[in-house]
């Protein structure tokens, strides 16, 4: 059956459903009402080899902020659910993704300790109708709710679409690396302490 997470999140602003399978093949069915976000989520599924289903309705007649953030929250929660106690995973992941002139580095740790260090310099304020300041908000929401330590670095790039897409591709590959099972660890917790904080807990 594989490692799976399913979240249904309802607020006064949005309703979001997320299902993720970590041991998938990259199947993706996404409809958030935010076209550019949908495009990026397809990159996440395809390059991470995650099976991903996301549906969202929200107050996009105002702007995309609430939907973007709540999709990130629900995705992070689903990811944390699928990882459970993180037993047997590699835990760390790192990837540098090029897209034409853009080059973005992502390093992450499924540590249970949320932190985001983000240094994308996206020239355009919007890509299509998508406000580029929402890119950071999305990753902060995912990391906080999945318990990820996440570092995102732009090494090169001038085209806004290329920079953001390279970021999502690098995140996908780093997350795939970190969440895959390490056959040498078998069922062990990947920590010298013998425990990792699960998403939503503190310690």
UniProtKB/Swiss-Prot annotation:
Biological process (GO) annotations held by this record are: L-histidine biosynthetic process
Class of enzymatic activity (EC top level): lyase
Enzyme Commission number(s) from the entry: 4.2.1.19
Keyword terms, alphabetized: Amino-acid biosynthesis, Cytoplasm, Histidine biosynthesis, Lyase
Q: Does the keyword Ribonucleoprotein apply?
A: no
Catalytically driven reaction(s): D-erythro-1-(imidazol-4-yl)glycerol 3-phosphate = 3-(imidazol-4-yl)-2-oxopropyl phosphate + H2O
**InterPro entries in the cross-refs:** IGPD_sf, ImidazoleglycerolP_deHydtase, ImidazoleglycerP_deHydtase_CS, Ribosomal_Su5_D2-typ_SF
Report which superkingdom the organism of origin falls in.
Bacteria
This protein's pathway:
Amino-acid biosynthesis; L-histidine biosynthesis; L-histidine from 5-phospho-alpha-D-ribose 1-diphosphate: step 6/9
Instruction: Please state where this protein is localized.
Output: Cytoplasm
User: What broad class describes the main subcellular location of this protein?
Assistant: cytoplasm
Q: Name one GO cellular component term.
A: cytoplasm
Keyword set includes Magnesium: no
**Record-linked Pfam families:** IGPD (PF00475)
Q: Which SUPFAM superfamilies match?
A: Ribosomal protein S5 domain 2-like
Q: Please list the GO terms describing molecular function.
A: imidazoleglycerol-phosphate dehydratase activity
- Membership in a protein family: Belongs to the imidazoleglycerol-phosphate dehydratase family.
**The name this protein goes by in its record:** Imidazoleglycerol-phosphate dehydratase
């Amino acid at each position: 059956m594989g490692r799976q997470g399913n979240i249904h999140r309802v607020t006064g602003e949005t309703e979001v459903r997320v299902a993720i399978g970590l041991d998938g093949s990259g199947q993706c069915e996404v409809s958030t009402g935010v076209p550019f976000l949908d495009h990026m989520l397809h990159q996440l599924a395809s390059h991470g080899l995650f099976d991903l289903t996301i549906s969202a309705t929200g107050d996009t007649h105002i702007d995309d902020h609430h939907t973007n953030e709540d999709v990130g929250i629900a995705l992070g929660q689903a990811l944390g659910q699928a990882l459970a106690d993180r037993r047997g995973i590699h835990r760390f992941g790192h990837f540098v993704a090029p897209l034409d002139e853009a080059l973005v580095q992502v390093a992450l740790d499924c540590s249970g300790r949320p932190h985001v260090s983000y240094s994308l310099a996206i020239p355009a304020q919007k890509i299509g109708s998508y406000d580029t300041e929402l890119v950071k908000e999305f990753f902060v929401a995912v990391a906080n709710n999945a318990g990820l330590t996440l570092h995102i670095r732009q090494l090169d790039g001038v085209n806004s679409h290329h920079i953001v897409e390279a970021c999502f591709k690098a995140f996908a590959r780093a997350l795939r690396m970190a969440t895959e099972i390490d056959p040498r660890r078998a069922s062990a917790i990947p920590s010298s302490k013998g425990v990792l904080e699960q998403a939503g807990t503190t310690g």
